[in-house]
């Protein structure tokens, strides 16, 4: 499954609606992200890792197989399942940069149950909006844009942009190659780095 | 040696609420080292905008606790200040092939506050704490071209906050 769409016109996932529908269920997204990370997995392993009841686990897996994003890899028992690659590619009109963001996007959506900032952003801007934000999060970590560039492009406040970029950062560093940048505590001269004290 | 420590929006967002360990780690670091973070006016405005559903970052708490303050007004009649402002604006625009006048002026303001402190002699080193790599690298690059290469350090706000947690 593959589609290309354009960030600037806002139709990021138009060709991607079946998966976008799927992404409405964070539990399914979590399950997909787990399988994408771990490779071949049995339903029993999923139940244990994601703390799912047997009936729920089978319902989710069957639903994902029906949608075409999971496939069974064995006919024997117990069956193992693996993800099918789904490549959603986003190209920006400005820079012509391309992003394949599917696995990262699905992982991000799966985190909305535990991350309030991601959940709030999806409620306001939808899954397509989150996909767009994810491309800015990659660009920001690579040093191509700032949170203010994103805010002005998307007509949101710089603070809202910064908040979602920070929420998405762990996903960006997991799925994309990011060179470390800048200094840290050790690069600040003349300071006492041993700040462990109880003065609060 | 006197240093100025200039903080961007992302540092305060990364710290979280004053009840969080991250906030407390930064506060402890500032107090222990007698550091007051300087916040450019435009950055302060950005941090205190009222958006519903989101917690306001703890900038006013840090100011009340006297380890952060708002920077004085930028003096554009100092040519280093206005050159730095324009230079960083162009640097950020070029990274993404945009017209320079589309670049929001809070990004270059971080470097301009540093430039003003360096040329007025109120500081001999400027540390810029930001989560925007492009703004940090832009500040270093432009001030280096002005002969202040050894006097400016971009501190990655994420690494800074995380490292303080580990100490």
Identify the meaning behind each predicted range.
Chain A
Residues 1-52, 56-200:
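Haloarchaeal acidic low-complexity proteome signature biased toward cell-envelope/secretome components but also
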């Amino acid at each position: 499954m593959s589609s290309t769409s354009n960030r600037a016109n806002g139709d990021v996932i138009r060709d991607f609606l079946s998966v976008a529908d799927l992404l409405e269920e964070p539990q399914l997204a979590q399950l997909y992200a787990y399988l994408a990370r771990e490779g071949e997995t049995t339903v029993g392993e999923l139940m244990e890792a994601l703390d799912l009841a047997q009936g729920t686990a089978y319902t989710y897996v069957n639903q994902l197989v029906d949608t075409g994003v999971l496939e069974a890899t064995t006919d024997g028992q117990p069956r193992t399942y693996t993800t099918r690659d789904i490549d959603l590619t986003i190209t920006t009109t400005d820079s012509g940069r391309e992003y394949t963001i599917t696995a990262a996007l699905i992982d991000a959506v799966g985190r909305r149950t535990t991350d309030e900032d991601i959940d709030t952003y999806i409620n306001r801007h939808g899954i397509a909006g989150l996909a767009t934000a994810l491309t800015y999060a990659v660009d920001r970590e690579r040093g191509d844009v700032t949170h203010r560039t994103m805010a002005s492009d998307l007509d949101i406040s710089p603070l809202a942009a910064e908040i979602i970029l920070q929420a998405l950062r762990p996903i960006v560093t997991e799925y994309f190659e990011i060179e470390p940048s800048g200094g840290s505590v050790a690069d600040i001269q003349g300071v006492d780095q041993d700040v462990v004290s109880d003065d609060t | 040696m006197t240093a100025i420590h200039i903080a961007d929006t992302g540092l305060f967002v990364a710290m979280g609420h004053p009840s969080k360990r991250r906030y407390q780690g930064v506060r402890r670091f500032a107090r222990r080292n007698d550091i007051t973070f300087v916040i450019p006016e435009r950055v302060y405005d950005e941090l205190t905008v009222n958006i519903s559903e989101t917690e306001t970052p703890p900038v006013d708490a840090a100011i009340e606790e006297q380890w952060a303050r708002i920077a004085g007004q930028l003096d554009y009649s100092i040519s280093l200040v206005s050159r730095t402002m324009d230079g960083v604006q162009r640097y950020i625009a070029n990274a993404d092939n945009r017209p320079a006048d589309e670049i929001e002026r809070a990004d270059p303001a971080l470097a301009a506050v540093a430039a003003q402190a360096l040329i007025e002699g109120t500081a001999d080193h400027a540390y810029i704490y930001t989560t925007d790599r492009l703004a940090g690298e832009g500040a270093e690059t432009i001030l280096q071209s002005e002969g202040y290469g050894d006097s400016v350090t971009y501190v990655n706000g994420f690494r800074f906050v995380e490292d303080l947690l580990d100490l």
